[in-house]
Amino acid sequence: MMRGASRHSRRRRLARIVCVAVIAVMFVEASRGHARAASDSPIRGYWVPRAALDSVDTVRRVVNNAVAGAFDTVFVPIALTADASRGFDGAAELIREARDRHLRVQAWIDVNRVAVGDEFPASRAHVVYQHPEWLMVPRALAPELLTMDPRVPAYLGRLSRWTRSNRDRVDGLYMSPLDPEAASYVAGLVTESVQRYAVDGVYLDAVRFPGSDFDYSRRALDLFRSFERPRLSVGDRARLDEVEAIDPFGYPSEFPSEWAAFRQVRLTALLTRLHASLKLINPLLTVTASIAADDALAREEQFQDWRAWISDRLIDGVGRRNGNGITILLVPDGLLPEPTLLPAVGQASVGGSR
């Protein structure tokens, strides 16, 4: 009798711990008082397209659509640009309208992706123009870019053209988390953006590498070389010097496992900074992150150690792209979900959760 009661108790406890939420279809937030509705009924979330923030009319139209569709929450794209607050602030207007209509608000923020597809920034104050040396470089293009000064316009132009011609595998320009200065810049922008708006949670999109063949920029290679070199013997250093004389990828080629771990650790370090900054703004914010639809792709190609992110309480849940849209799984208290409870894997997409 006691054993049966224990099993029922465990089932009830598990049900309280994990709830699955399907964005654009339906999502259910986990059982935390600050992150859920007064009842345990499902909460419907409306994914706001960026184009809906262009004017007051489009903002009101999208809020009306959310209310008419019986959605309870809106996910609002927040731009990470230094001049995002100039002119009409569609995000602020949408949040005001949403609050007036008793809708909850989640901020949707691109982290490492700083330019999307063909939508490269017009303002020369944007980080892609001010610090092109911070942008990730694919290995295929690196031999050419390593011979160029990142400050000359031809450098960014070449990287942009390559990105446009490879849309099937990369969806924009990405800032590298390997450079400490770049990581500080990103963390600062995310903090400023969330401070500007009264939101209930933050969904971190594109907190990843586009693929395992990124980042082969000069700065990234130098950082990895500086990290590995002190651990080598004098003889190994001399040998690597000879290798580098003919192969600019000498250190990554000689130490592939360490190179992968280096990128994974630096990405996790960036997420750690983001989590600390966001919880300092508001400890009740839910922080979730987008991960690839395929688990191996997330770990081995995009360097997302998301299980450690959960167990270390860096995030409150994960989002996955599947055939039905975006699925968010909230996992409070750092408890890893059972594999069967993870969002089902559907179609993988280079574009992540866009």
Question: In which residue ranges do the predicted regions lie?
Answer:
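Boundary/entry segment of secreted carbohydrate-active catalytic domains
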Residues: 37-59, 291
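Aromatic-lined carbohydrate-recognition surfaces of secreted/lumenal glycan-active proteins
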Residues: 106-110, 203-210, 253-300
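The substrate-binding groove and active-site-proximal loops of carbohydrate-active enzymes
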Residues: 45-53, 83-86, 169-184, 255-267, ...
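Short, acidic/polar
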Residues: 52-67, 182-193, 297-312
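Catalytic domains of carbohydrate-active enzymes, especially glycoside hydrolases
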Residues: 58-82, 197, 317, 326
